[in-house]
Structures are given as structure tokens and as C-alpha cells.
């Protein structure tokens, strides 16, 4: 990489790759008289701290357990009183648990009060406890805390809860992130004193007046100061807020220093990386080594490093070998490139693989390994997300962190599943790599394919590059496992039992707390009675025993849990305990439900169901707010303490992602919730939206409605975008979904995102498709939204301090905002095939931006977008006008401006490429576009897509200037880059392949035969690519254009085959291609088109020359009376008039003028330009001079229009009546050698019915009909203009007087469909 490119790459690459960051969770410790301070910090300071954390890949959340909110109510049931009693007795234990969970972060607020404490100085002894229920509240707390990991509390039993928390956080551990704030004035005590009478039952007067308490708090402050901890003194709330902000913003800065964060960046991929790292770390904490795990480790490592030995030290991109591997992929010998680790659910596959990945990466840091754990997040199960993640990681790792990956997020091809798979195949061919995909039985298909196809791996090629190793894990009974076992390249490793009894005990002990591990011996005899327990069962039971003993007899629970046969039954028992020990239900009058739903109920049930129904998970504060909206308020309120007790019991199985959202850690728990609590048989993520409305799924539909109403009122865009449209879809609320995606506020936010991720774009396209299927016109809704934006017609908003995302006003919208939003909507409509609507919006945006001189950068974006749209639908002269406008605007910016603006550089690349494809040679020379392109090409090496585009642009411009040899090199470099970006089946790759195949015949030299062979191979690959593109195209007119283009390629391939040695096999192959081309032209251009006439004439000449006996029987029936009678069918067919798609005054003119220069570059030998074909004496065969059926000069002019149509299968040209045919121009040198160039026809207006057709090269075509030498006649026919659908040419046979058409061929014509009847 050049210094200029390196400098530019550093400036451009503002998006850092986020690393795994632990959240900042300070524990808030204070006495009861600090409610006002806590409220102020929670509302004013902590949200600001969370904002700066969120931009650095983490979050800030203060843990504030407000025990004062926990009160008993006279309406409590007996079970609720039991819950209340258990909760009060674990006050100290739960607080210390959360102090440990929050370590090393701690905030202490101290004043003049100390808190409740035991006044008796007599030490409290556990051995003296005979009746737990007879103990006082304070002693119960000491007993529970001492029995659950905190025996040290018995050494100082006379401390208050506040001092116990401070001792645990500060004096038993060391940390630099602990801050104390001492209140120096008693003014804030007034509120507390005024409420003293109302709180007599809870706060006695002795609490404040006791001299012993004052002395204790004084000593505590002295100890804190004496330890050297940071202490701040404040007088009022504002001063406290400033101190807390200053201290904790400095903590954030120290832990996670500020990097160059670009605004409005979609960090979806970076966060996904964090989730998988977090999953590995969690599995490492509970992993237990055994003989079985060591054996499996060895198998996995041997498999992973096999065939990689020679490449372990290679750290650079092996582009050449990668491309070779792509080309060889179908001919590779069968090798074991996939390892499948299978086993029963719960046997420990995920934990084992996660630990092996960590172990392998530490042993072999130079080997490229990318792990992916399905289910590590709620949205990680979709197959499109999985493949996209692998591609992103492979490209980053293979090409360095500075590589810009915008091409994946910009290219519409990645929205098509089959094309994304091709990108994946290209990515794994870059260099040796090991991919790990755990839990494949949980894969689903939401956006690309069906869930069944995602699971059966039929999308994966039958063979992979030998240097790519794919390690998968699955449940033995799954569809994925059965499908993969049938593949010859899969090695099966069955994970059997966990090992001996000691291993089982170690797994059980690993999931116990340190205090419980000391009493583990009491559980051993019970566990020995169940020798076949899986690791998952052991983990579930062990983690459950830590908390259930506070509420019930732990050994009775253990026996009950061990009796169940399956994991599903075990979860049902545990869910039942959670509901009984932590939950309560609402009375019918308090609930928001219209009807009573049978089955388990209560807030714990509701929380689990909400988590299961959510699209991407829910945060703790969101769940508590949801419970409040569902009726859990007042004395039914779920307080922070109730929530803390529940989370402490479920922390192992309901975990937090790095962004703070909760999710189910194991699929078995999700399945149990779906089956037992929701009552559904189909997994929620795979269910149909319409099914939610059935009475059987009324509960599921209810929770979708609850979440939909909740997120309609939320203020954080990404959370709204993640959840709200999903629940609208699942609820069948089509009107609301349509209003959401066309809402100006939503559009405004998305349009600000500089590089939307695949996930963000997939959602928009997915919801469009869903609405379209439901019969909603989304494009019309977008146009109405634009009309409101332009007219500034916005609803009057209610006066509230905060507005939801959907209520945000655009009343103060600027001209730049309007232009940005309209351009975004226009681009999206164009992507979805709404060309007419997109054109109107682009033109409207240009008019708007022209009125604002300061909006030059956005204006050139609009002008370039308009030009590309016109180029796509064939209106090249109009498109050129806008490209020239954009070029003029770009000249206002200096090279320095381009270096510091990524968007400007991208626009420069696009405009130069579009000019090269549409502008005349004079314009390009006068404006020195080639010199500009050469300079700009140095600065885009960091963006592979733009780099390839510039190579292509340079090649076209060099070809226009006559340097064909150097142009060919540029095209080959472009092909190399596009191959390793997109694979071998992308239409962009096909285009450059076809271009090179055409160009080869201008540069035939000593290796003429090998070049012909390469060109033929290129043509065959292009045909496959175009056939594939046709299958994914949804627009009828797009398929028509693809079919016509395919017809041309078939003719070119046939022409090259016939220009060879005329062996029987090559001739028959050429004839088959001609017949395919004939069928396509008859279907799409009409049976009266002149090119059909010419192809039939060529086929008859081939038949006559080869003889009837060698002609395929299937073809003879078309000509029962010989070639003359058959040809009479087309005698009086009129010429079909087409409209133009391209200007004749383009670079093609320059290339036609320089054709002789190309010949000189090719060779100076006179034999190559002889007007006579080469003849091999005695062989009876003649080798024709090279025939270029579709020239390289013309190919680049259709690059933009064809590629954009091909790239987006959804796009529909705006005017269906306008076809875009191509005319053929014959090029004849001074020696009479026939060369063909296919040139697009020109027209000033696509709408006019009469196109002005301008011939670039007007030399008359000499076509003597040689009866004595049939092969010479065929070579002339192959070189004719009618071989392509030329609008200006009408085939006229040399010999007049052909007989009338036969009745058989007349019937064939009558049955042909009129292509214009669409």
C-alpha cells in the first residue's frame, strides 16, 4: 500500500473494531435518608454516563437496591407472606452478592446516620441456632449470610448493613474505582425528618438520636479516609452531580479510552464479535477437564491443522492461490474438510468447543480461526447473519483491520441468499482458515431461505477449499446432523459420556458457590444413585441448589430434580419453583388482559414470556417498566429487591449481553418456556405471523401486543427499530408496520447512518416484502411521507418533556435534511424496483439542493444517482448530462478535500466510472479524466470495491486512448479483486469476464489458441452467471434484458466455436448454443426480428455443409424440405424498430477509429490480417481468423445499466415499453478481415417511439455467397451483423427467389408470444 493510500485509509477508517469491554456497574451504598440523592443521580447523571459508554462497546448501570420499597401488605396471600419473610431474611446476603457482582465499582453515600444494627455485644454463633424462625430479623440476616459464603459477618455482628457492604467492597478487596461522597449539611435531612412520623413503624426515633450510631458512622468515615480512598464532600445535589460526573467519566475514559468514533455508524458487526467472546469467557469459567474432553481436543486439533502446515506462517493474502482454489473447487478430490461434533442435547458440546477454541487460539495465534456460537444472542440464529459474519471476519483478518468493508453493506447482491453464499465461498478461499459453528440445529431462516434449508446445509457447496476447515456441532437427532452425515467430506465425531464419576462430581462442584462446595460431600451419596446425568442436568441442578435452599429444603429439591427423565421435565420443575418462590399474580381487575388465559401466571411467567417473545432481548429496566404497564404497581409492584432476588437465582441461565440486554443462555430453557409457559409447539422465532392470531396462541399474541405498545412510546431509536416492527409483523398489524417504516422520523435516523449494516438493510427489505405480500403499497406511503416532508406538514405534538421515536418532530428540518431523506427514500425505492417513483424523488432532491449553494456535496450525490438511474433504464444521453453536472461539482473540491472525506472520494470514483461508460472520447480527453483516474486510484486501495471499479475505469479509458495491452492488464486486476470479493458467480465478475473474452480477440498473438480457449471458458462461465441472475430476478422486464444479453453471449460463444477447427463436436455444441439463442430471441424480441432470420440461415448453411446424416434428428424436422424451403419462412419478415439505449458518440467511437492500432499491438505479422482463411493442406479444414461477436469496445458502455439491473433482482425499469436492443457494427480492416463490434443504439429520448440510430463505422460488409466452399460461407455468416439483435439491419440473402415458408414454420410463428404484450 502506498503512503498516500495508507494516510487516506487511516483518515477514512473512523470506525474502530470494538473490543470486549466489561460493563461499568457501580453498587450504590447509602443509608435510607439518601433517597433524594439516589433519584437525582439516576435521572440526571447516570444516563449521561451510559451514553459515553455505549459508544465504546459497553454500558453504565448503577445497581441500587432500595429496600425501603419492600413492604408487606394486608392483602398478601400466605405464599406472598412466605416470600416476604424469605426476602427480608436474605437482605444482607443479597446485598453482599450484588456488591461482589459489581466489583470493582462502588459508590458510597454517607451522612450523619448509620443504619440498623444489633445493639447487643454478644457474639452471634451459628451453633446456637436451634429454631431459625424464632430469630430476630437481624440475626436471620446474619445466619443466612454466614451460611451462604460470608462467614466473616459473624466476627463483627454489630455492624449496620451499610457498613457490611463497605467492608465487603473496600476493606476485604482493593480497587481504584471506589468513590465516597460525604454530605456536609443537614439541609437535606429536612424531608426525612418531616416524614419521620409517617415512618414510625420502620424508622424509630432511636435510629437518629442514638449516640452509639453517631459514633459508629464517625468511626466508619475515619476508616475510609484513613485508607486513602477518594472522598468528596458536597452540600447540594448540583454539587454532588458534578462530582459524580467528573469522577466516573474519568473512570470510563481510563478503562475504555476515547477513539475516533464516527457519528451515526451501525456497529452491529462489532457488537456481534463481543457476544461470541463473552460466550467463550462464560464457558471457560465452568469447564471441567476430563479424559473425554482431552481426547476430543486432540481430534479437533489434528483435524484443524491438517493441510495447514505449509501455511501456518503465512500472514498475507494469497490472492492468487485463493482464486485458483475457487476455480478448482468443483474438481477437488474428496477430502474431509468438515468435522461434525455430534451428541445428545446437554452433553457439553458448546462448552467443550468454546474452551477448545480458546485453547487453540492461544497455542496457534497465527492461524486464522473464527468461532460463531448460534444462540449466543437472540438474533444470531438467522443463517444470513451467520454467513455475513463469517465473510466480514474473513475479510478483516485476511486483509488487515484498515480494510473498508462497505462493499458488503453497499452491494445489493448480499441481500440475495445464494449470492451471499458465493461471497462466502470467495472469502474462505482467501487464505487458510478454520471456521467453528456451534449449535447448527438452532439455525433458522427469516430473511433468506426456509428454516429447513438453513438446517440441512444444502446451501453449502459439495466441496470446500482444502485449506478451509469447517468445524460444526449439532444434536445427534437433528436434521442438520442427518444431512451432514450423508456428505462424503464430513468427518463425524460423537461426543459420548462425560467420563467417570469424578468428572461428574467435578462438573457439579464447578457450578456451586465456594460456600456450597464445602458442603458438597452431603450431596455425593444422592448423586451416585444417578450415574447417567448429563453435564447440562448437573449444571442446572447445582446452580439451582444455591438459591432454593433459602426458600425450601435443598436435599428434598435435589432428590426431586434427580427423579426426572429429561432436561425438559427438569426445567418445568424449576420454572414451577421460580413462580412459587418469587412471583405473584394480579387479580383480574388489576391486569391489562381482556380475557383470562389458562396456564401458569404471575410476573415471573410474564418476564420469561416477554424475553422469549422479544426479537433481540430486553433490558432489566425495560422489563420492570413492562411489568408496571401490565398492572404490577402499588402493592403489587416488582421492586428492585424482588428483581434482584429473581436475577440471583437465574443469573446462570438468563445472562446479559455486552449491550445490557437479557437473553436465554441455553436453548433448552427457551424451549421449556415456549412449551410450558407460552403453550406453543412451534418455536417463536420460526412461527408464522398469521398463526399468532389463532385462539391457541392467544397468549403469544397478547405479549406481542404488549411489546408493540411499549416500544411505540420509547425514545431510543435502535431499541425501537429492533423490536417495534417485528412485533407489528408478528401481530399482523400491517397498517402500523407500513406507517413505521415510512415514518419521517425513522427515515431521518436511518438516512443519517453512514454505512447501514446488513442486518439493518435486511430488516427494511424484509418488512417491505411482508407488507407487499399482505397487499400494502409501501411505495405510495413513502411518497406521501415525502410530500409531508416537502410541505412541512407535521402533526401537532403533545407537550411532554420526552418524545418517543415515532413522535419526534421534524418541524425544524433544514434543506439539507430534506435532501438527505428524499435521496435515501429514492435510493430505497430504486432498490425495490420502483424506478418511476425513484426518478421523481431524485429530481425533486436535485431541485431542492440547487437552491442551497452550500449543499454541493449532497447535490453531486443526487446528480450521480439520477444519472445512474437513467443509465440503468437505457437513457444514456440524459444520464450523461447529470454525470457531467456531477463532474463539474466535483472539480470544486481539491484533492485534499477528497482525502479527508470518504463520501466525496466514493462519489468521485462513481462519477469517473459512469463518465467512462457514457461520455464521448472528446469529453474524456478534454477533461483529462484518465489522468484524474490514475491519481484517484492511489487513494482507494483500502476499499476493495472502489479499487476494482477504478481498475475497470482506468482500463476503459486506456482502451479509449489506444493502449489495449495495458487496458487488458487493468481489466485482469479488476477481475482478480472482484473474484476474491464476490466469488465466481457474481454478475460483476461475469461482466468483466465477458469483457476480457471479447478483448482477447483484439490481442491475439503467438498464444492464439490458448487465448481462444480462455475466451471460450470465460463465455461459458458468463452464461452460467447470467442464467443464475435470471433465476433470482423478480421483475419481468429485468428478466427480458437478462435473456437478451444471454442470447448475445450464446451467439458469441457459438461464433468462437465455429471459428476454430470445425470438428463435429464443436460444431454441434455451437449449433445447440445458436438454438438456445434463437429461442430466447423469438420469445423476447419477436419472431420477425432480423437476427432470427440470420441465425436460421447460418444453421442451414451448417446443415448443408455437414450433411444431413450428421445432423441431429431433433433438428431435421424443422427443415423437412431442405435448407432452401426452410429458409423461405423468413423471406418477407419486416424489420423490428427498437429505441436506443446508448449514445453513439461515446468512447466506442475512439476505439473504432483506433482498431488498426489494436491490430498493431496484437501482431505485426501480415498473415494475421490476410483476407483468406488459414488452410491446412490435406486436412480439408480451414481455420477462420478470430471473430469478435461482441466487442470489448462496446462492452464497457453497457456496464452501468446492465450491472445495476442484474445486481438487484427486485428492480423494475420505469418504462416497460422501452427495450434496449443492441446494434452490431462490422469492422473491416484494409485487408478485408471481418471484425464485429456490438454497439448499443443511441437515442435522445427513451420515451419517443422513433430512435435515431447512428452507425459508428459505416464500411459496407462484403458477403460473397460461396457455393463451392461452404465453410467459407459459414465463416462469413458467423461474422454478420444479424448475429446480434441489430435494430438497423434487415437480413437480405444474396440469392433471390427463396420459396415460400412451410406450413410447419407458419404454425411455429403463430404460436410465438408477442414480447410486447406484458
UniProtKB/Swiss-Prot annotation:
Residues 1302-1318 have a biased composition (Basic and acidic residues). It comes from Mus musculus (Mouse). This is Tetratricopeptide repeat protein 41. InterPro entries: DCAF12, NACHT_NTPase, P-loop_NTPase, TPR-like_helical_dom_sf. GO terms for cellular component: cytoplasm. Residues 1295-1318 are annotated as: Disordered. Keywords: Cytoplasm, Repeat, TPR repeat. Pfam families: NACHT. PANTHER family: DDB1- AND CUL4-ASSOCIATED FACTOR 12-RELATED, DUF4062 DOMAIN-CONTAINING PROTEIN. Highly expressed in lung and myeloid leukemia cell line (at protein level). Isoform 4: expressed in heart (at protein level). It is found in: Cytoplasm. TPR repeats lie at residues 401-434, 653-686, 819-852, 860-893, 993-1029, 1047-1084. It comes from the Eukaryota.
Amino acid at each position: 500500500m502506498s503512503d498516500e493510500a495508507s494516510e487516506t485509509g487511516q483518515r477514512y477508517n473512523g470506525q474502530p473494531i470494538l473490543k470486549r469491554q466489561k460493563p461499568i456497574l457501580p453498587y450504590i451504598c447509602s443509608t435510607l435518608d439518601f433517597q433524594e440523592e439516589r433519584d437525582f443521580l439516576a435521572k440526571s447523571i447516570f444516563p449521561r454516563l451510559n451514553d459515553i459508554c455505549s459508544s465504546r462497546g459497553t454500558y453504565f448501570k448503577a445497581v441500587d437496591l432500595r429496600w425501603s420499597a419492600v413492604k408487606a401488605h394486608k392483602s398478601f396471600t400466605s405464599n406472598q407472606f412466605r416470600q416476604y419473610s424469605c426476602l427480608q431474611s436474605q437482605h444482607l446476603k443479597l446485598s453482599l452478592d450484588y456488591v461482589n457482582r459489581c466489583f470493582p465499582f462502588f459508590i458510597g453515600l454517607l451522612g450523619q446516620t448509620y443504619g440498623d444494627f444489633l445493639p447487643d455485644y454478644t457474639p452471634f454463633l451459628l451453633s446456637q441456632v436451634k429454631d431459625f424462625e424464632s430469630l430476630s430479623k437481624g440475626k436471620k440476616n446474619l445466619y443466612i449470610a454466614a451460611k451462604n459464603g460470608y462467614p466473616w459477618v459473624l466476627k463483627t455482628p454489630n455492624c449496620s448493613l451499610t457498613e457490611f457492604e463497605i467492608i465487603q467492597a473496600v476493606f476485604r478487596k482493593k480497587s481504584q474505582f471506589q468513590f465516597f461522597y460525604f454530605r456536609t449539611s443537614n439541609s437535606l435531612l429536612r424531608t426525612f425528618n418531616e416524614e419521620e412520623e409517617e415512618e414510625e413503624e420502620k424508622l424509630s426515633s432511636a435510629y437518629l438520636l442514638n449516640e452509639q450510631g453517631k459514633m459508629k458512622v464517625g468511626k466508619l468515615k475515619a476508616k475510609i479516609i484513613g485508607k486513602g480512598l477518594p472522598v468528596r464532600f458536597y452540600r447540594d445535589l448540583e454539587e454532588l452531580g458534578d462530582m459524580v460526573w467528573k469522577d466516573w467519566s474519568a473512570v470510563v475514559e481510563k478503562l475504555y479510552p476515547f477513539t475516533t468514533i464516527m457519528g451515526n455508524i451501525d456497529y452491529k458487526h462489532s457488537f456481534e464479535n463481543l457476544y461470541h467472546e463473552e460466550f467463550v469467557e462464560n464457558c471457560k469459567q465452568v469447564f471441567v477437564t476430563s479424559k473425554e474432553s482431552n481426547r476430543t481436543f486432540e481430534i479437533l486439533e489434528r483435524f484443524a491443522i491438517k493441510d495447514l502446515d505449509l501455511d501456518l506462517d503465512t500472514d498475507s493474502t494469497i490472492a492468487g492461490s485463493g482464486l485458483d482454489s475457487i476455480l478448482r473447487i468443483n474438481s477437488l478430490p474428496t477430502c474431509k474438510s468438515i468435522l461434525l461434533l455430534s451428541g445428545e442435547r446437554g452433553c457439553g458440546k458448546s462448552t467443550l468447543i468454546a474452551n477448545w477454541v480458546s485453547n487453540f487460539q492461544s497455542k496457534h495465534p497465527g492461524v486464522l480461526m473464527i468461532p460463531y456460537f448460534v444462540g449466543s444472542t437472540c438474533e444470531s440464529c438467522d443463517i444470513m447473519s451467520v454467513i455475513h459474519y463469517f465473510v466480514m471476519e474473513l475479510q478483516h483478518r485476511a486483509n488487515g483491520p484498515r480494510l473498508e468493508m462497505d462493499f458488503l453493506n453497499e452491494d445489493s447482491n448480499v441481500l440475495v441468499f445464494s449470492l451471499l453464499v458465493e461471497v462466502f465461498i470467495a472469502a474462505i478461499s482467501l487464505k487458510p482458515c478454520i471456521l467453528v459453528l456451534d449449535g447448527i440445529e438452532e439455525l433458522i431462516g427469516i430473511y433468506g431461505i426456509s428454516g429447513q434449508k438453513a438446517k440441512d446445509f444444502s446451501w453449502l457447496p459439495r466441496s470446500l477449499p482444502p485449506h478451509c476447515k469447517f468445524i460444526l456441532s449439532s444434536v445427534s437427532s437433528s436434521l442438520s446432523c442427518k444431512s451432514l452425515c450423508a456428505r462424503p467430506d464430513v468427518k463425524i465425531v460423537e461426543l459420548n459420556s462425560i467420563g467417570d464419576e469424578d468428572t461428574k462430581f467435578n462438573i457439579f462442584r464447578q457450578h456451586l458457590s465456594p460456600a456450597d462446595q464445602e458442603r458438597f460431600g452431603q450431596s455425593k451419596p444422592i448423586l451416585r444413585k444417578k450415574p447417567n446425568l448429563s453435564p447440562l442436568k448437573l449444571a442446572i441442578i447445582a446452580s439451582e441448589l444455591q438459591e432454593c435452599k433459602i426458600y425450601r429444603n435443598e436435599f428434598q429439591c435435589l432428590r426431586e430434580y434427580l427423579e426426572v427423565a429429561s432436561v425438559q421435565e427438569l426445567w418445568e420443575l424449576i420454572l414451577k419453583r421460580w413462580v412459587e418462590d418469587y412471583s405473584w399474580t394480579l387479580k383480574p381487575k388489576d391486569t391489562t388482559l381482556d380475557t383470562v388465559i389458562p396456564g401458569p401466571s404471575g410476573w415471573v411467567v410474564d418476564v420469561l414470556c416477554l424475553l422469549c417473545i422479544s426479537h433481540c432481548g430486553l433490558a432489566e429496566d425495560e422489563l420492570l417498566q413492562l411489568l408496571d404497564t401490565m398492572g404490577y404497581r402499588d402493592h403489587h409492584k416488582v421492586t428492585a429487591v424482588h428483581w434482584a432476588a429473581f436475577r440471583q437465582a437465574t443469573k446462570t441461565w438468563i445472562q446479559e449481553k455486552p449491550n445490557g440486554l437479557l437473553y436465554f443462555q441455553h436453548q433448552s430453557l427457551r424451549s421449556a418456556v415456549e412449551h410450558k409457559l407460552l403453550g406453543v409447539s412451534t418455536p417463536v422465532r420460526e412461527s408464522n405471523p398469521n398463526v399468532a392470531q389463532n385462539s391457541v396462541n392467544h397468549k403469544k399474541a397478547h405479549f406481542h401486543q404488549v411489546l408493540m405498545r411499549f416500544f411505540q412510546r420509547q425514545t431510543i431509536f435502535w431499541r425501537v427499530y429492533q423490536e417495534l416492527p417485528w412485533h407489528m409483523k408478528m401481530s399482523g398489524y400491517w397498517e402500523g408496520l407500513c406507517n413505521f417504516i415510512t415514518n419521517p422520523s425513522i427515515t431521518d435516523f436511518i438516512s443519517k447512518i453512514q454505512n447501514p449494516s446488513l442486518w439493518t438493510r435486511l430488516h427494511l427489505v424484509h418488512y417491505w416484502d411482508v407488507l407487499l405480500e399482505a397487499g400494502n403499497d409501501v411505495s405510495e406511503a413513502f411518497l406521501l411521507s415525502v410530500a409531508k416532508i416537502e410541505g412541512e406538514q407535521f402533526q401537532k405534538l403533545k407537550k411532554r418533556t420526552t418524545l418517543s421515536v415515532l413522535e419526534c418532530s421534524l418541524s425544524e428540518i433544514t434543506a439539507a435534511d430534506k435532501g438527505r431523506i428524499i435521496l435515501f427514500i429514492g435510493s430505497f425505492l430504486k432498490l425495490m424496483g420502483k424506478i418511476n417513483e425513484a426518478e421523481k424523488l431524485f429530481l425533486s432532491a436535485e431541485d431542492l439542493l440547487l437552491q442551497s449553494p452550500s449543499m454541493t456535496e449532497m447535490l453531486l450525490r443526487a446528480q450521480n444517482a439520477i444519472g445512474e438511474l437513467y443509465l440503468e433504464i437505457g437513457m444514456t444521453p440524459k444520464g450523461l448530462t447529470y454525470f457531467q453536472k456531477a463532474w463539474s461539482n466535483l472539480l470544486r473540491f481539491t484533492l485534499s478535500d477528497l482525502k479527508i472525506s470518504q463520501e466525496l472520494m466514493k462519489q468521485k470514483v462513481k462519477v469517473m466510472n459512469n463518465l467512462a461508460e457514457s461520455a464521448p472520447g472528446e469529453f474524456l480527453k478534454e477533461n483529462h479524466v484518465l489522468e484524474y483516474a490514475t491519481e484517484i486510484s492511489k487513494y482507494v486501495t483500502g476499499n476493495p470495491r472502489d479499487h476494482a471499479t477504478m481498475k475497470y475505469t482506468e482500463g476503459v479509458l486506456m482502451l479509449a486512448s489506444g493502449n489495449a495491452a495495458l487496458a487488458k492488464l487493468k481489466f485482469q486486476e479488476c477481475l482478480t479483486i472482484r473474484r476474491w470479493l464476490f466469488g465466481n458467480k457474481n454478475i460483476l465478475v461475469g461482466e468483466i469476464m465477458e469483457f476480457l473474452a471479447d478483448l482477447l480477440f483484439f490481442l491475439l498473438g503467438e498464444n492464439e489458441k490458448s487465448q481462444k480457449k480462455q475466451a471460450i471458458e470465460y463465455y461459458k462461465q458468463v452464461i452460467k452467471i447470467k442464467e443464475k441472475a435470471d433465476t433470482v430476478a423478480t421483475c419481468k422486464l429485468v428478466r427480458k434484458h437478462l435473456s437478451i444479453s444471454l442470447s448475445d453471449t450464446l451467439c458469441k460463444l457459438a461464433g468462437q466455436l465455429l471459428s476454430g477447427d470445425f470438428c463435429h463436436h464443436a460444431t454441434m455444441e455451437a449449433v445447440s448454443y445458436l438454438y438456445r439463442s434463437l429461442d430466447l430471441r423469438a420469445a423476447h424480441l419477436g419472431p420477425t426480428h432480423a437476427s432470427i432470420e440470420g441465425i436460421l440461415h447460418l444453421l442451414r448453411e451448417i446443415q448443408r455443409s455437414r450433411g444431413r446424416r450428421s445432423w441431429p434428428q431433433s433438428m431435421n424436422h424443422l427443415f423437412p424440405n431442405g435448407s432452401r424451403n426452410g429458409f423461405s419462412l423468413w423471406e418477407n419478415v419486416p424489420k423490428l424498430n427498437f429505441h436506443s439505449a446508448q449514445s453513439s458518440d461515446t468512447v466506442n467511437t475512439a476505439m473504432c477509429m483506433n482498431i488498426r492500432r489494436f491490430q498493431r499491438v496484437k501482431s505485426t505479422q501480415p498473415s494475421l490480417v490476410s483476407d483468406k482463411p488459414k488452410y491446412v493442406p490435406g486436412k480439408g479444414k480451414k481455420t477462420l481468423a478470430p471473430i469478435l461477436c461482441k466487442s470489448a469496445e462496446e462492452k464497457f458502455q453497457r456496464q452501468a445499466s446492465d450491472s445495476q439491473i442484474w445486481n438487484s433482482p427486485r428492480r423494475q425499469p420505469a418504462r416497460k415499453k422501452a427495450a434496449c436492443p443492441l446494434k452490431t457494427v462490422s469492422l473491416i480492416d484494409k485487408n478485408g478481415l471481418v471484425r464485429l463490434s456490438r454497439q448499443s443504439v443511441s437515442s435522445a429520448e427513451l420515451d419517443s417511439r422513433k430512435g435515431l440510430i447512428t452507425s459508428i463505422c459505416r464500411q459496407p460488409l462484403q458477403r460473397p455467397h460461396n457455393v463451392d466452399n461452404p465453410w467459407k460461407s459459414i465463416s462469413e455468416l458467423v461474422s454478420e451483423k444479424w448475429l446480434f439483435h441489430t435494430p438497423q439491419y434487415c437480413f437480405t440473402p444474396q440469392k433471390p427467389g427463396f420459396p415460400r415458408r412451410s406450413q410447419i414454420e407458419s404454425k411455429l410463428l403463430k404460436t410465438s408470444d408477442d414480447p410486447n404484450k406484458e
